């Protein structure tokens, strides 16, 4: 985005503790989330309006259960396969219940630390049982091919990531 360009996206400020909800994380842009601030389109359908997102910690998050940004490793690949088998259209109804290969990881960090995550990585905010408020800023970036690739990225997660595609191709060739 050019410097000085107007920002047309909504901003998100969470003012209450985030729990585990249905016992797991989520993908942004689904009805289960229920608000446009996290990517739900105005017409109520699911959306993939960004390529990756960044979470920037503004204060120290020293250990688990401090409101940590929490991710399920490999979930982007698990959901890629799930959407290949069942279609991404199931997202219009709900967040699919899929068994994750690994437990969630509470990401710890210091002020200024940045976590970059793929749009299809299952994530949430962990409960915060510490006496400190967890402050973070979340950015969603839209790659230049995001709109062109559209929903195809659900079943080909690296479709708009040329550099990553090349690395994966080379690794599989060896």
Predicted regions and their residues:
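Non-heme Fe(II)/2-oxoglutarate
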Residues: 84-90, 97, 111-116, 120-174
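Conserved double-stranded beta-helix
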Residues: 1-68
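Short edge-strand/loop segments of extracellular domains
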Residues: 16, 72-79, 140-146
